[in-house]
């Protein structure tokens, strides 16, 4: 079973976006809202990083608001899953909504992993790349 770390916005701010992933078969998920001790940064930060380190894939949804924590999670996963800086990470999916700003940064983000614009596209991409990594 492939493990997926779900990074990004909390369900309450993004229409329960993570719940659609959890319906998928053949995957297990680390959802920081439930699987990391949210008592304080002293507990959730190491729990989140352990979940990322143990993951085969990451789906990140930074939403449209500032998402500093999400970008830290993405960077850590990217660093663990590429051989050298600048490589494309074939295990990383980022949901980049069309209304996300600033738009100039999408050129940079495109170099990191797969960029999709919706949860539906992210689910399709996850299923596709999981087959390639069997």
Residue ranges and their predicted role:
Residues 1-134:
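Conserved catalytic or regulatory cores that recognize and/or transform ribose-phosphate-containing ligands
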């Amino acid at each position: 079973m492939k493990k997926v770390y779900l990074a990004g916005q909390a369900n309450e701010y993004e229409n329960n976006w993570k719940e659609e992933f959890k319906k998928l078969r053949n995957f297990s998920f680390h959802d920081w809202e439930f699987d990391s001790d949210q008592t304080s940064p002293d507990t959730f930060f190491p729990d989140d990083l352990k979940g990322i380190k143990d993951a085969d894939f990451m789906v990140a949804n930074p939403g449209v608001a500032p998402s500093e924590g999400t970008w830290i999670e993405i960077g850590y996963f990217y660093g663990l899953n590429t051989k050298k800086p600048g490589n494309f990470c074939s295990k990383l999916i980022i949901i980049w909504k069309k209304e996300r700003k600033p738009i100039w940064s999408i050129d940079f983000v495109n170099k990191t992993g797969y960029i999709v614009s919706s949860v539906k596209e992210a689910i399709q991409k996850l299923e596709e790349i999981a087959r390639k990594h069997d």
